[in-house]
């Protein structure tokens, strides 16, 4: 008859106190359940290799020393079985108390106290059980760190997504899919870093806190520096700092880091998110499109093995599966904003008439007719953004460059060289969501001042996402910013698509959450 320690009937509190009593009893016997070190020199793969020529119910003469976390514990008569996990490998440990513990009752006491979640070190002989399972027949087991709390099952985690986000350590211990997702995330960031290093970019770090906010149209987080007695903002983007570096002669720079925006939380938005921004002197937005295509298509091939793959996130709340074919083959599709809106709305927007008051009136009227909700203040920027979201973004399933942004939507972008009222800016969308924002950088100081004044007008109208005026940055431009292209890529959403995540919180180790209800 076997006894399993996998599922405890007692309450979590009772289990916790029982485990503490067990550990205190072991410690009273002189057993250190939190040793400083355990020496081991083998891996689970060493065991699998050693057992290749071993038959069922046979032992080799190969000794191993290993460590791992117990994920299942079973007692059958006088033999204890432990399934131990390390990294992505699992291995069975067999401990025969008749053979190993006759002259060492403390050893039996130790192994009988081992439960799921405990971290153990063990020494033994490689072999196979009667059923042919590869095992280590242990003659010594040591508790290296006990798990005092009841160890949840993978089933419990899947049915309770809040537990995943609030207790990521537990999720990673029992949910292999989650572990793999974050391993893939690391590979994605590593590939991006290697790509830019390879083409001659310098990785830099810029401030997270600053007494000004800029670089993107977004609502910032505010904090206070007690010693300096000043308010500081968490950065919404590192753009203005990175362009200062280009002015200073660092002609190819990039930064991978956190940005913060005090805005909504949903399936694809988290207030704290990871992005890469890169700036390249003597390049324009056409060059940036080529870089984005090469970077992302290569990344997709690395992770998925092909430019084409199926994005199929599983929504835990509904268990509904969505299958979205995505194709990152180059060149990416392109859509011009005004051309597409004119076709969809049956109107005639141009770069010349887009800034006229009657154009804003027309767009407000169209939105009312089509029941498109736009929050006040209904600025031209907000109206255009709403129509882009309604008519253009849903067309962008495969990677698509959206181009032709009017000046009012792009205060830091340079005027288009041949289209009045338009900037040399693009956003790249995939699966209807923005992944990339880039443009030929505006490097004319007086024109940049004028753009900031336009943003001031929106701010005075009540737009709390308008970009604030930054005279210091304009003075930086007066030292000479060479023709430059700048680009930002959201890493979290990219990871979502490459790991079949339905929620951005699934690809952020510690996402922003509401306070837990006590």
From Swiss-Prot:
State the oligomer form and interacting partners.
Homodimer.
**UniProt GO cellular component terms:** cytosol
List the catalytic activities from the record: tRNA(Lys) + L-lysine + ATP = L-lysyl-tRNA(Lys) + AMP + diphosphate
Q: Which residue windows are transmembrane per the record?
A: none
**Lineage of producing organism:** Eukaryota, Fungi, Fungi incertae sedis, Microsporidia, Enterocytozoonidae
What processes does the entry annotate via GO biological process terms?
lysyl-tRNA aminoacylation
- Superkingdom as given in the UniProt entry: Eukaryota
Q: Of which family is this protein a member?
A: Belongs to the class-II aminoacyl-tRNA synthetase family.
Q: Which Gene3D superfamilies match?
A: Bira Bifunctional Protein, Domain 2, Nucleic acid-binding proteins
The name of this protein is Probable lysine--tRNA ligase, cytoplasmic
Where does the record place it?
Cytoplasm
State the organism of origin: Enterocytozoon bieneusi (strain H348)
SUPFAM superfamilies cross-referenced by the UniProt entry: Class II aaRS and biotin synthetases, Nucleic acid-binding proteins
On whether Chloroplast is a keyword of this UniProt record, the answer is no
Q: Which GO terms describe its molecular function?
A: ATP binding; lysine-tRNA ligase activity; tRNA binding
Keywords assigned: Aminoacyl-tRNA synthetase, ATP-binding, Cytoplasm, Ligase, Nucleotide-binding, Protein biosynthesis
